[in-house]
UniProtKB/Swiss-Prot annotation:
Species per Swiss-Prot/TrEMBL record: Staphylococcus haemolyticus (strain JCSC1435)
Gene3D superfamilies reported in the protein's UniProt record: Vaccinia Virus protein VP39 (3.40.50.150)
Keyword terms of this UniProt record: Cytoplasm, Methyltransferase, S-adenosyl-L-methionine, Transferase
Protein name in UniProt: Ribosomal protein L11 methyltransferase
Listed NCBIfam families: prmA (TIGR00406)
Protein function: Methylates ribosomal protein L11.
């Protein structure tokens, strides 16, 4: 199977919206190449510099590379994406550019690894590719070894970083955690590293469940985390202290009431994957259901919300 790489250059202001469009239309991964990275490329903390090549980055704005199964990427899908992006309110037509190419499966399986290096995702957590060697800076640093596979994120997206920071703040070792839409399993692994004993990782995609299980094994926690296919929380009967969901906003909106019902009293709902334009809508529904909003964090057009269940 081959992949169609759809490359879209846009102004920075609309990057989260375009990412959301691509994910909604079924992209199997999005690579972000930001022109600002050429200006702000410090020596990294691992003792070497990953030098960025100017020719790999747009002159202005952000290049988003989205990957679609070639057999599913037809004229209809192409036109829907172009129309949705072109019609965005704050799109800069002087920056906007579309291009595409076909990438063979064997090339893509390794190509995405060029973008993935060890990085500090939060105060405590460092994400380390499974194929790289890394030495911790100090004993307090917690390393998550990750091989996300081509269809899942590497943990460097703002939504993941904000979720990890929320986990550091709100998750205790005596809590129970359910991770909805686990993907690569990174948030479940983080919970395990904090000492959580009961963790359940759900994903509607069986491929995601398998990738998560492989990453659990890499982090020596495969026996500590239950990873199963599941359709959000619709059939969940067990109660948990923490519900985590880093997924798309419209899916989060549909599961807010189920999240509330799944939580024990005083439990927390940690959720991200929400673009700025939709966060008030999500906030309002969470409050209407009964959540006490504990924090709302913003990062590069994305939002992470934490709500607490304060009564049964």
């Amino acid at each position: 199977m081959n992949w169609t790489e759809l490359s879209i250059v846009v102004n920075h202001e609309v990057e989260p919206l375009v990412t959301d469009i691509l994910e909604n239309y079924g992209s199997n991964g999005v690579v972000i190449e930001d022109s600002n990275d050429l200006i702000n490329q410090p020596a990294d903390k691992f003792g070497e510099i990953y030098e960025l090549k100017q020719e790999d980055y747009p002159e202005k704005g952000v290049r988003l590379k989205a990957y679609f199964n070639e057999l599913k990427f037809d004229d209809s899908l192409r036109n829907k994406i172009k129309t949705a992006v072109t019609n965005l309110e704050n799109i800069d037509s002087t920056v906007l550019n579309f291009s595409e190419q076909t990438i063979a499966e064997v090339d893509w399986e390794n190509e995405w690894k060029n973008y993935f290096h060890p990085f500090r995702a939060s105060e405590k957590f460092t994400i380390v590719p499974s194929w790289e060697q890394y030495t911790k800076e100090d004993d307090s640093e917690m390393c998550i070894e990750l091989d996300p596979g081509m269809a899942f994120g590497t943990g460097d997206h703002p939504t993941t970083s904000m979720c990890l920071k929320a986990i550091e703040t709100y998750v205790d070792s005596d809590n129970s955690v359910i991770d909805v839409g686990t993907g690569s399993g990174i948030l479940s692994i983080a919970s395990h590293l904090l000492g959580v004993k009961r963790i359940k990782a759900l994903d509607i995609d069986e491929l995601a469940v398998n990738v998560a299980k492989e990453n659990f094994a890499k982090n020596h926690c495969e026996d500590a985390i239950e990873a199963v296919p599941g359709n959000l929380l619709k059939n969940e009967t067990e109660k948990f202290d923490i519900v985590i969901a880093n997924i798309l906003a419209h899916i989060i909106e549909d599961m807010i009431e189920d999240a509330y019902n799944t939580l024990n009293k005083d439990g927390y709902f940690i959720t991200s994957g929400i673009i700025e334009e939709k966060h008030k809508q999500i906030l309002n529904k969470m409050q209407n259901v009964g959540f006490d909003i504990k924090s709302v964090n913003h990062d590069n057009g994305w939002v992470c919300i934490v709500g607490q269940k304060v009564s049964e």
